[in-house]
C-alpha cells in the first residue's frame, strides 16, 4: 500500500477549510456532489458492452466500487471527517489508499459546521443527485448536524411499497372515523366523480424497510383534515385554527363547512402552511392531509 501521509495532509487541509469558512466553498460544490453520489447512490448493474468502451467503463466502475467502500468505512468511523475525506481523496487515489493506517493515526477533529447554510447546501446536492433518500446520507446529516434520528428506516428509499388496500379492511383496521375521512380523500372523491367504484383504494399505502419488518410507515390520505385533527388532537387543533384564522379569516370557515357538507370535487390544491416549530399542517382546498 502507498503511504497515506500526503493524502492525510490534504484531508486535514480540507477539514480546516470547511471549519474556517463554516460552509462549503462554491468551487467545491460540483466535486462534492460527484463524490457524494459515488458514496451514496444505489449500485448500478453492469451493462454489457464490447471493445475499448467496455474496458474503460469497467475500470471506472471498479474505481467507484473501491471508493464507495472506503468512503462508507470513513463515514462509519468518523462522520465529521467524511466530507473533507471525499473532497481530498479521489476514486483513483482510493485504489492505493491505506485506510487501516489512516484510521490508526487519525484523531477526530470534531465538528466543522456549527451554524450556517451548509445543511441546506448538502440537501440540495443530495436532491440533485437523487441520493436524499439514502440511509447513509441521512446518517451523515444526523451526525454532522446533530439531527434527530428517523422514526423508522422506511423513511429512506430502501423499502417495499404496498398499495391498493381494500375498503372493508381499512374500516376494520382503523374504525369508522378514520374510514369516513379516507372516503372523503381527494383520491376517493375524484374516483366517485368519474363513476369509478372499487373496494380497493390508493388512499392508503405502506412502506416496509428491506432490512427490517418490525417497523413501517402507514400513510393515509384523508379529507376533512381539520375535523379529523380536532378528534385526534383537540387542544392543538384549536391553536392551529386560531393561528390560521388570524392569517386568513376564510380558512377556519372553509374547513369546518367542508367537514359538514363535504369537499367540493372541483376544488384544486392550495399550498401547505407551516406554523411555528410545533405544528406543521398540510392544507389543501379539499382539506386533504397525510397521517404517518
From Swiss-Prot:
GO terms for biological process: cell adhesion. GO terms for cellular component: nucleus. Keywords: Cell adhesion, Nucleus, Virulence. Induction: Expression is induced during murine pulmonary aspergillosis. Signal peptide: none annotated. Disulfide bonds: none annotated. Disruption phenotype: Impairs the formation of the hypoxia-typic morphotype and restores classical biofilm architecture. It is found in: Nucleus. It comes from the Eukaryota. Residues 156-186 are annotated as: RNA recognition motif (RRM)-like domain. Changing residue 174 to A: Impairs the induction of expression of cgnA. Its main location: nucleus. A motif (Bipartite nuclear localization signal) lies at residues 48-70. The N-terminal bipartite nuclear localization signalis required for nuclear localization and generation of the H-MORPH morphotype. The RNA recognition motif (RRM)-like domain is not required for nuclear localization but is necessary for induction of the expression of the HAC cluster genes such as cgnA. Hypoxia responsive morphology factor that modulates the expression of the subtelomeric hrmA-associated cluster (HAC) containing genes that alter the hyphal surface (such as reduced total chitin or increased beta-glucan exposure) and perturb inter-hyphal interactions within the developing biofilms, resulting in a loss of vertically aligned polarized growing filaments. Belongs to the hrmA family. This is Hypoxia responsive morphology factor A. It comes from Aspergillus fumigatus (strain ATCC MYA-4609 / CBS 101355 / FGSC A1100 / Af293). The gene is hrmA.
Amino acid at each position: 500500500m502507498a503511504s497515506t501521509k500526503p493524502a492525510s495532509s490534504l484531508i486535514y487541509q480540507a477539514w480546516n477549510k470547511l471549519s474556517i469558512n463554516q460552509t462549503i466553498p462554491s468551487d467545491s460544490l460540483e466535486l462534492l456532489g460527484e463524490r457524494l453520489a459515488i458514496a451514496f447512490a444505489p449500485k448500478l448493474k453492469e451493462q454489457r458492452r464490447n471493445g475499448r468502451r467496455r474496458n474503460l467503463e469497467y475500470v471506472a466502475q471498479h474505481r467507484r466500487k473501491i471508493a464507495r467502500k472506503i468512503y462508507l468505512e470513513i463515514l462509519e468511523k468518523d462522520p465529521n471527517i467524511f466530507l473533507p475525506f471525499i473532497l481530498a481523496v479521489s476514486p483513483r487515489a482510493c485504489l492505493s489508499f491505506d485506510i487501516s493506517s489512516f484510521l490508526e493515526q487519525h484523531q477526530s477533529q470534531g465538528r466543522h459546521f456549527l451554524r450556517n447554510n451548509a445543511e441546506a447546501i448538502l440537501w440540495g446536492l443530495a436532491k440533485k443527485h437523487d441520493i436524499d433518500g439514502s440511509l447513509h446520507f441521512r446518517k451523515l446529516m444526523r451526525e454532522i448536524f446533530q439531527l434527530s434520528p428517523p422514526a423508522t428506516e422506511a423513511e429512506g428509499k430502501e423499502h417495499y411499497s404496498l398499495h391498493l388496500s381494500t375498503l372493508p379492511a381499512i374500516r376494520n383496521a382503523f374504525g369508522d372515523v378514520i374510514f369516513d375521512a379516507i372516503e372523503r380523500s381527494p383520491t376517493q372523491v375524484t374516483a366517485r366523480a368519474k363513476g369509478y367504484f372499487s373496494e380497493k383504494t390508493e388512499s392508503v399505502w405502506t412502506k416496509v424497510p428491506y432490512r427490517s419488518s418490525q417497523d413501517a410507515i402507514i400513510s393515509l390520505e384523508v379529507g376533512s383534515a381539520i375535523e379529523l385533527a380536532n378528534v385526534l388532537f383537540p387542544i392543538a387543533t384549536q391553536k392551529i385554527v386560531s393561528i390560521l384564522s388570524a392569517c386568513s379569516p376564510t380558512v377556519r370557515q372553509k374547513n369546518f363547512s367542508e367537514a359538514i357538507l363535504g369537499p367540493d370535487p372541483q376544488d384544486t390544491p392550495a399550498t401547505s402552511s407551516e406554523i411555528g416549530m410545533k405544528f406543521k399542517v398540510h392544507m389543501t382546498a379539499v382539506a386533504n392531509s397525510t397521517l404517518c
